[in-house]
Amino acid sequence: MTKPIVFSGAQPSGELTIGNYMGALRQWVNMQDDYHCIYCIVDQHAITVRQDAQKLRKATLDTLALYLACGIDPEKSTIFVQSHVPEHAQLGWALNCYTYFGELSRMTQFKDKSARYAENINAGLFGYPVLMAADILLYQTNLVPVGEDQKQHLELSRDIAQRFNALYGEIFKVPEPFIPKSGARVMSLLEPTKKMSKSDDNRNNVIGLLEDPKSVVKKIKRAVTDSDEPPVVRYDVQNKAGVSNLLDILSAVTGQSIPELEKQFEGKMYGHLKGEVADAVSGMLTELQERYHRFRNDEAFLQQVMKDGAEKASVHASRTLKAVYEAIGFVAKP
């Protein structure tokens, strides 16, 4: 029986955080045995906002090395760079012609990004969800791991696939959202009611995977808890968001359950909790960074991973694009 196909992509812009790792990357690693996983570094999406060319190239290789350091295995999964497989852009253009202006106008992420990048509201930013649909539909994807911010885009991908299939027959699989069984939702350190984000302007809210572990310890020790007197280490997201966030992080790193941790810190001060979280996270990052630097310093290996991944991806992508071109009436290339 063939494994279900899972597709996920991440931009090479901005450093990945422990939130990305605990909430997504670790789940990707665990999925590799049960699913046919396709992981894409979406550099074409990245240029919808202005990029420095040199920094973008570096960030792409950094992201690839980080994926490998986190445990994505190129022997088990297909991992590649979006611009290395031209079928993404080719299908994206075709799907533009089956997507309505009104649908794209309603995308909340376009509205948010337009407000943030008012000096560069470009057509690529507007059509971003169509290219995302092409990314997914090219591989006859069954499942797409999505966060809250991408749910609307996946719904559009499903609508486009169903619209196209209604016209031309079953060309595309209609993808379903995939919600992993577990995955910590890591919140901002100083504003624990909002999710930790790699694009947060206040870097004290964020722990990057490549950050100096000593700096991480300082940030965690400054993290928000609460003013209860005496202090009570208890999991209560509603009333003790900061303490709950620290417990979530510690549980994700150590594997201990929340009730076990509550018992462990019974009668202890918040400083004890912060110290344990700081030690656990800095230890995890030290090991991860050692693996990262090993991969990042071997550029020949990274080039080979990208080449092999693009070749594997192209086999699937070209098959789908051929079916699409035939359906819409393009003359086959001699």
Curated annotation (Swiss-Prot):
Task: Give yes or no: UniProt keyword Cytoplasm.
Answer: yes
User: Its catalytic activity?
Assistant: tRNA(Trp) + L-tryptophan + ATP = L-tryptophyl-tRNA(Trp) + AMP + diphosphate + H(+)
Biological process terms from the Gene Ontology for this record are: tryptophanyl-tRNA aminoacylation
User: Where located?
Assistant: Cytoplasm
**One Pfam short name:** tRNA-synt_1b
Gene3D superfamilies given for it? HUPs (3.40.50.620), Tyrosyl-Transfer RNA Synthetase (1.10.240.10)
The reply to whether Protein biosynthesis figures as a keyword in the UniProt entry is yes
Q: Where does ATP bind?
A: Q11, P12, S13, G19, N20, G147, E148, D149, V186, K195, M196, S197, K198, S199
Coiled-coil portions: none
A single GO CC term for this protein reads: cytosol
User: Where is the motif 'KMSKS' region annotated in this sequence?
Assistant: 195-199
Q: Where is this motif: 'HIGH' region?
A: 12-20
Binding sites annotated in the UniProt record for L-tryptophan? D135
InterPro entries, A to Z:
aa-tRNA-synth_I_CS (IPR001412), aa-tRNA-synth_Ic (IPR002305), Rossmann-like_a/b/a_fold (IPR014729), Trp-tRNA-ligase (IPR002306), Trp-tRNA-ligase_bac-type (IPR024109), Trp-tRNA_synthetase (IPR050203)
Keywords from the UniProt entry: Aminoacyl-tRNA synthetase, ATP-binding, Cytoplasm, Ligase, Nucleotide-binding, Protein biosynthesis
So what EC number does this one have? 6.1.1.2
Q: Which GO terms describe its molecular function?
A: ATP binding; tryptophan-tRNA ligase activity
The family this protein is said to belong to: Belongs to the class-I aminoacyl-tRNA synthetase family.
The job of this chain, per UniProt, is described as:
Catalyzes the attachment of tryptophan to tRNA(Trp).
Task: Note the subunit structure.
Answer: Homodimer.
Q: Which NCBIfam families does the record associate with it?
A: trpS (TIGR00233)
Name of the protein in question: Tryptophan--tRNA ligase
Q: Which organism is it from?
A: Shigella flexneri
Its taxonomic placement starts with: Bacteria, Pseudomonadati, Pseudomonadota, Gammaproteobacteria, Enterobacterales
